[in-house]
């Protein structure tokens, strides 16, 4: 079985390049899998001989190449269609349809303006706006950059947690970034030090799983806010995070997806 790992373009891994590479290496290591950058022109040639592809790719070209591999019967994780569905505005619709709690548009503590078409590539793609004037300026900046697909969400006080999961396995973990200080852009500091409010871990896992299922994205991560009364909302959801806080466990769970796919494939 030939296993290939497709590394996402570096612009999609801001401040996380090595962490993203590390999880991909951990996943493909037992098979001595080859890792290739999604923008490498030789990607189609490599995919032509692959049996299993673990992909973090996000560019349209790479996703099209992976579509073709899927049509040939190659197991691709995450599926390219799932990655496309992880655009923020698409996820918002899927979350509402799947009864997954998300922030309202209006609140009393400011707003977050988020680029909706692709994952954040820089700090300028996710902007905190403390008042209406700041929101108007941020919207004008988006328009000047040609960004007309965006999401506006109210900022909600509470504990910020990061969660990580792999569908069809027992793997689901969450962490408080305020405890260890790990951060991509530093936005987590807006919610301050965590209070570790009590909440239903089962319900959080269930909500994240519903969204991952709707998005067809089995390898996922995201952020949630826990309020003092234990209510939570999902504020972000990502295809294949770095899993840096739980890399070994995550890699094992991701590999389980291949075994499950093989078990469900009809034998000739």
What are these regions (language model features)?
Residues 2-10, 71, 81-160, 198-202:
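Active-site nucleotide/adenylate-binding loops and adjacent lid/helix of ATP-dependent enzymes
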Residues 8-104:
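Conserved N-proximal alpha/beta basic substrate-recognition cap immediately N-terminal to
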Residues 10-11, 59-60, 82-84, 118-119, ...:
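Short, solvent-exposed loop/turn segments at secondary-structure junctions
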Residues 15, 63-66, 88, 122-124, ...:
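Short glycine-/acidic-enriched loop or helix-start segments at secondary-structure transitions
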Residues 50-54, 114, 163-165, 230-245:
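A short beta-strand motif that forms the metal-chelation/ATP-contact edge
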Residues 116, 155-156, 164, 223-225, ...:
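Anionic group-transfer/hydrolysis microenvironments
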Residues 129-215:
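Phosphate-binding site of ATP-dependent enzymes
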Residues 183-234, 238, 246, 253-267:
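A long amphipathic alpha-helix within ATP-dependent nucleotide-binding catalytic cores
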């Amino acid at each position: 079985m030939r296993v290939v790992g497709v590394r996402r373009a570096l612009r999609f891994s801001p401040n996380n390049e090595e962490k993203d590479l590390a999880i991909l290496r951990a996943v493909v290591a037992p098979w001595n899998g080859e890792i290739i950058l999604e923008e490498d022109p030789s990607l189609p040639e490599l995919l032509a001989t692959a049996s299993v592809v673990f992909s973090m790719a996000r560019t349209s070209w790479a996703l099209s190449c992976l579509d073709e591999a899927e049509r040939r019967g190659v197991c691709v994780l995450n599926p390219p269609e799932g990655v496309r569905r992880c655009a923020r505005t698409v996820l918002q619709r899927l979350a509402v349809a799947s009864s997954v709690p998300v922030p309202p548009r209006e609140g009393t503590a400011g707003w977050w303006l988020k680029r909706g078409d692709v994952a954040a590539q820089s700090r300028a793609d996710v902007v905190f706006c403390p008042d209406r004037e700041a929101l108007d300026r941020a919207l004008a900046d988006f328009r000047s950059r040609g960004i007309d697909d965006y999401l506006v969400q109210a900022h909600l006080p509470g504990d910020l947690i990061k969660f990580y999961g792999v569908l069809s396995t027992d793997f689901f973990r969450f962490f408080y970034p305020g405890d260890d200080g790990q951060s991509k852009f530093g936005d987590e500091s807006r919610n301050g030090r965590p209070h570790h409010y009590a909440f239903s871990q089962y319900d959080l896992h269930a909500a994240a799983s519903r969204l991952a299922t709707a998005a067809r994205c089995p390898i996922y991560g995201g952020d949630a806010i826990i309020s003092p009364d234990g209510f939570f909302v999902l504020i972000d959801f990502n295809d294949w995070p770095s899993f840096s806080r739980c890399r070994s466990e995550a890699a094992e769970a991701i590999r389980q997806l291949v075994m499950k796919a093989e078990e469900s494939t009809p034998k000739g």
